[in-house]
Amino acid sequence: MERQARGLLETQSLHEADEDMVTDVDFTSMISEEEKEELKAELAKLEDEISTLRQVLAAKEKHLIEIKQKLGMSLMNELKQNFSKSWHDMQTTSAYKKTHETLSHAGQKATAAISNVGTAISKKFGDMRSHSISYSIRHSISMPAMRNSPTFKSFEEKVETTVTSLKTKVGGTSHTGGSFEEVLSSTAHASAQSSLAGTRLPESEEELQC
């Protein structure tokens, strides 16, 4: 095995050496003067043809620009057309289609989530409004019932009695009846008159003493 490996290595090194020798060989010494002249003539001919082709290409490009200008095709329009074509080509690729489908699916999920949140908020506000309305209805219904209760009537009678006694003290005429709001108003008025009478009594006594 070792001998075979060494033989292969020696063969490869000899082959590489032969290639190096070939590249270093000067081919000019292997051709005749006539062949050199023919090759030089062919080279000059090729250079002339290339130069002519370049001139023809430049003339054709100039003519192309003139035609586009006459047709109103500007450079910007050409760029737009190229961009549109590139965009169309990109949209037809499988990678773009897969990415577009993924983003579309994600957008649908986001829209559904936002819709669910909006529905929940609307439902919450609706429940709060219904609760407020029902509370107002219960409150309006419970007020007459409360005023007709024995406890409230007893309190109302006590207030009326107090108003009557206050009016008697200040020399007013006593009368019963009326709504509870009128009774409370009469109580406040009677209390004010009682306070005013209390402040005037000492002045009368001082005048009598004088």
Swiss-Prot record:
Domain of life: Eukaryota
Biased composition, class Polar residues, residue ranges: 185-197
Subunit comment: Forms a homodimer or heterodimer with other members of the family.
UniProt GO BP: G2/M transition of mitotic cell cycle; positive regulation of apoptotic signaling pathway; positive regulation of JNK cascade
Source organism: Gallus gallus (Chicken)
Protein family according to the UniProt entry: Belongs to the TPD52 family.
UniProt feature coiled coil, ranges: 22-73
GO terms, molecular function: protein homodimerization activity
Pfam entry (one): TPD52
KW Cell division (keyword) present: no
Keyword presence, Coiled coil: yes
InterPro entries: TPD52
Protein name: Tumor protein D53 homolog
Disordered: annotated span: 185-210
Protein keywords: Coiled coil
Cellular component annotations (GO), alphabetically ordered: cytoplasm; early endosome; perinuclear region of cytoplasm
